[in-house]
């Protein structure tokens, strides 16, 4: 079983003051609704038998609701994130909260970007690692070495401007993608199964995934991935808390005997985050 204990915060400071990814639009966020959605997701986690560690969100941090970006945790060890400048206020707070749980923390070297669990998905012996947007490849190598995992680095397709050039996000000054974090393109179903969207990843990355023979793979529909946040789910290996707008993936999971729970979400996704994004896997 996976995702048996999760750390969550809250949407108390969730706003759209700075548009840190392509999902922030001109449509205003309803914070009260976002808080209710967050509470419903946490309720779904508990329905699935998951233990929840609830901490206050860091004050004044609009993206502090997305705890998945705070670190990656394995066997009582956490490698802390190096977030974009707009989220730097979360870093020390996140480390403090994990250390309060008795978790030993390590820091990625200072000159590298690293997006925590958002860009590092562990499945059995593998670490599926995003690079090129919110995480540097050197940071992912550091993480894999520290956690003793076999590194599989992949790269999502970029967001393009009308002229075909790669879009640079003005809030981060980095290249942007609709799959800026890997947990929008790949999900871990159990220790032997992943679900992923080939259309979200470049050709080399697809070849890497296809070459892995000791994992079962579920292909995720491109529209469900991009419009329904299909991959941004939390699975225990028995229950899956997932998008209500991904019927094909839901059917594929139910055909494998998994129980799917599908809360309705409209506000949290406006910040580019969904079910996986608001939860950090502790054990």
List PLM regions with ranges.
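The feature marks the mature, well-folded catalytic cores of soluble enzymes
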Residues: 1-283
């Amino acid at each position: 079983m996976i995702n048996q204990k999760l750390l969550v915060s809250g949407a108390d400071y969730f706003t759209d003051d700075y548009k840190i990814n392509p999902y922030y639009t001109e449509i205003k966020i309803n914070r009260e609704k976002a808080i209710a959605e967050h509470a419903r997701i946490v309720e779904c986690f508990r329905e699935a038998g998951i233990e929840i560690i609830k901490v206050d969100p860091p004050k004044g941090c609009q993206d502090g609701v997305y705890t998945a970006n705070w670190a990656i945790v394995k066997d009582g060890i956490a490698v802390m994130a190096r977030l974009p400048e707009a989220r730097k206020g979360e870093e020390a707070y996140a480390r403090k909260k994990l250390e309060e749980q008795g978790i030993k923390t390590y820091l990625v070297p200072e000159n590298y970007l690293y997006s925590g669990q958002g860009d590092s998905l562990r499945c059995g012996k593998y670490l599926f690692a995003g690079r090129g947007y919110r995480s540097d490849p050197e940071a992912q190598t550091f993480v894999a070495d520290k956690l003793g995992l076999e590194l599989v680095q992949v790269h999502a397709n970029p967001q393009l401007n009308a002229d075909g050039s790669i879009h640079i996000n003005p809030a981060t000054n980095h290249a942007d993608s609709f799959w800026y974090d890997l947990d929008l393109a790949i999900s871990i179903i159990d220790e032997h199964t992943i679900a992923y969207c080939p259309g979200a990843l470049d050709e080399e990355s697809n070849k890497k995934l296809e070459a892995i023979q000791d994992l079962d793979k579920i292909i995720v529909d491109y529209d469900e991935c991009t419009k329904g946040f299909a991959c941004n789910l939390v699975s225990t290996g028995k229950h899956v808390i997932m998008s209500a707008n991904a019927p094909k993936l839901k059917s594929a999971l139910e055909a494998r005997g998994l129980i799917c729970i599908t809360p309705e979400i409209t506000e949290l996704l406006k910040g580019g985050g969904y079910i996986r994004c608001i939860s950090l896997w502790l054990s």
